[in-house]
Amino acid sequence: MTATLALTEDLIRRRSVTPADEGCQAILETRLKALGFDCEALVSGPDDFRVTNLWAVRRGTQGKDGKLLVFAGHTDVVPTGPLEQWHSDPFAPTHRDGKLYGRGAADMKTSIAGFVVAVEEFVKAHPAHAGSIAFLITSDEEGPAHDGTIKVVEALSARGERLDYCVIGEPTSVDTLGDMVKNGRRGSLSGKLTVKGIQCHIAYPHLGRNPIHEAAPALAELAAEVWDQGNEYFPPTSWQMSNIHGGTGATNVIPGHVTIDFNFRFSTASTPEGLKARVHAILDRHQLEYALDWTLGGEPFLTPRGELSDALSSAIEAETGVKTELSTTGGTSDGRFIAKICPQVIEFGPPNASIHKIDEHVEVRFIEPLKNVYRGVLERLVA
């Protein structure tokens, strides 16, 4: 068994459902301290949702004047779902048909193990490496993410720590290892819209005001609106409704209000402020009586082609023969926080088809090549 596979299995055995870490970071800290890393635990969150974060750094011979390459990842995993639907215990790493099964196998314990072992090999080969290496690990990525990476970023920013490159171990590949990496992500802006009416008997509509009827034309206009055209890196901004709630449950009552949940996934071609203003303008034009609460989940970030993307693309092709695709598709990630203090952020990991699903898995044949790609990035950027 390879060192990467052994560490992956050890991490999968830990029932680290958000925000629990269940000792994963202690395992990493032990191995990193043995390599000369300075390790710092940053614990945050309320008593009923304590989040464990790890910042570990090994300075190169150039010290703080040299480049700093960070690996960012999360030890937490999503809940298993119905255990009876799994073909094996999700926290007992199981091999079947050339695949390693377990919760977190793809998202993202294999990536964490791969980068740790890559660093172990790299430091052995280059004990006097020039650039610096760091790990930023959290147990709150799959949850609300209020006390995870964002807290570490705030602490690093406050002390003036400069990050030059960041590789996030998210599972970005699609059909085969290395066919896609993420060099950016769209922003997320959510709204909870409550349109007010007047409740009354459904047989006497003239005595009330139906908020569903009043909201419908405005919602249709919002759904049809072209928010932007996107750009060379991002598709056009998308506006989608996720929930509509109105009524008392009775079939003979016009409701007093209706609540609509919606979400923007927006590109760098739009801003949160601009999108908000346009939504309010449409609602006001329809003369609705409404309240609207906004939540900014994250702003878009983009890493143009440069040193990090070139190093990663080159390492992928050297190891796998695959020419990777730079993409900004998909949901949000902790990259939205890290990009505030790091100019080059790229996500790369194993195929993602099984993430968050029953029988999550990673193909064993991809585990060592993943580690080798990570080592290739280290060789190219901080040796």
UniProtKB/Swiss-Prot annotation:
One MF term in the entry's GO annotations: succinyl-diaminopimelate desuccinylase activity
Annotated InterPro entries: Bact_exopeptidase_dim_dom, DapE_proteobac, Peptidase_M20, Peptidase_M20_dimer, Peptidase_M20A
Catalytic activity: N-succinyl-(2S,6S)-2,6-diaminopimelate + H2O = (2S,6S)-2,6-diaminopimelate + succinate
Record-listed Zn(2+) 2 binding positions: 107, 142, 356
Binding site for Zn(2+) 1: 74, 107, 170
Alphabetically ordered keywords of this record: Amino-acid biosynthesis, Cobalt, Diaminopimelate biosynthesis, Hydrolase, Lysine biosynthesis, Metal-binding, Zinc
EC numbers, comma separated: 3.5.1.18
Catalytic residues (positions): 76, 141
Pathway note: Amino-acid biosynthesis; L-lysine biosynthesis via DAP pathway; LL-2,6-diaminopimelate from (S)-tetrahydrodipicolinate (succinylase route): step 3/3
Cofactor note as given: Binds 2 Zn(2+) or Co(2+) ions per subunit.
Chain coiled-coil ranges: none
Gene3D superfamilies: Zn peptidases
GO BP annotations, alphabetical order: diaminopimelate biosynthetic process; L-arginine biosynthetic process; lysine biosynthetic process via diaminopimelate
Cofactor(s), by name: Zn(2+); Co(2+)
Keyword Amino-acid biosynthesis: yes
Annotated Pfam families: M20_dimer (PF07687), Peptidase_M20 (PF01546)
Function: Catalyzes the hydrolysis of N-succinyl-L,L-diaminopimelic acid (SDAP), forming succinate and LL-2,6-diaminopimelate (DAP), an intermediate involved in the bacterial biosynthesis of lysine and meso-diaminopimelic acid, an essential component of bacterial cell walls.
Family: Belongs to the peptidase M20A family. DapE subfamily.
Quaternary organization: Homodimer.
Name this protein carries in UniProt: Succinyl-diaminopimelate desuccinylase
Species of origin: Cupriavidus necator (strain ATCC 17699 / DSM 428 / KCTC 22496 / NCIMB 10442 / H16 / Stanier 337)
